[in-house]
């Protein structure tokens, strides 16, 4: 058992360490205050261009429309020229009849050239083949609203398993999440209930397979 003198010496040493830590903490606070905001707030919401704003507006409108699977409205994503334009498909009347997550993303990004929406948006595989080796594939840590985020499901396919649209990255970080609006998925409806259709949910970085950001040449001229 330590003596009284030894304990007093330990207390004195700890008090010195606390004072040194206080000085270091105060200096760090001063240094932080002098930095521009952008130097440490790396997840600040960026300026959104018109194409991205339009996609986010359309995504939110579909979510607020409370589209539950199956729904006649899903035919618009699949068959109309504002979605993927697969007009030859049979009417969607049964849950699981076709995987339509990419068709929903195409509906949101309707300003993208029709040929791209028709040929690339319909599946994770098509996106990976067309964009996986291009500048559209970005660092997942740089995800922004409007980006197409392909996530893993149980299969964890190399191309990813499900297509989503990022609508908010304000809570993102290595331990945080983004908010997505998705079609053909389970999540939250506008009234807070849980179900399948056009839903909103949170996705963590560990779920990301690939993040794609469309480039200017992908859009129709306005």
Residues covered by each model-derived region:
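Short intrinsically disordered terminal tails
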Residues: 1-2, 143, 219-222
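Short, highly selective alpha-helical patches that border small-molecule cofactor pockets
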Residues: 7, 102-105, 164
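N-terminal capping segments
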Residues: 30-112
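...with weaker cross-activation on analogous glycine-rich loops/strands in unrelated enzymes
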Residues: 115-190
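Active-site signature of cysteine proteases
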Residues: 170-222
């Amino acid at each position: 058992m330590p003596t009284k003198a030894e304990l007093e010496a330990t207390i004195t040493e700890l008090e010195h360490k606390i004072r040194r830590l206080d000085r270091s903490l105060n200096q760090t606070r001063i240094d932080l205050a002098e930095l521009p905001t952008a130097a440490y707030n790396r997840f600040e919401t960026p300026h959104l261009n018109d194409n991205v704003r339009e996609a986010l507006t359309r995504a939110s409108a579909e979510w607020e429309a409370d589209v539950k699977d199956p729904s006649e409205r899903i035919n618009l994503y699949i068959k109309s020229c504002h979605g993927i334009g697969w007009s030859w498909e049979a009417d969607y009347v049964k849950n699981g009849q076709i995987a339509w997550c990419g068709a929903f993303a195409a509906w949101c990004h309707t300003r993208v050239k029709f040929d791209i929406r028709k040929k690339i948006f319909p599946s994770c595989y098509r996106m990976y083949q067309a964009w996986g080796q291009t500048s559209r594939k970005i660092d997942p840590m740089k995800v922004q609203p409007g980006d197409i985020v392909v996530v893993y499901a149980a299969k964890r396919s190399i191309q990813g398993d499900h297509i989503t649209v990022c609508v908010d990255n304000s809570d993102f970080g290595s331990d945080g999440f983004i908010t997505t609006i998705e079609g053909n998925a389970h999540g939250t409806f506008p009234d807070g209930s849980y179900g399948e259709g056009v839903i909103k949910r949170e996705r963590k970085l560990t779920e990301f397979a690939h993040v794609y950001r469309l480039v200017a040449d992908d859009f129709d001229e306005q």
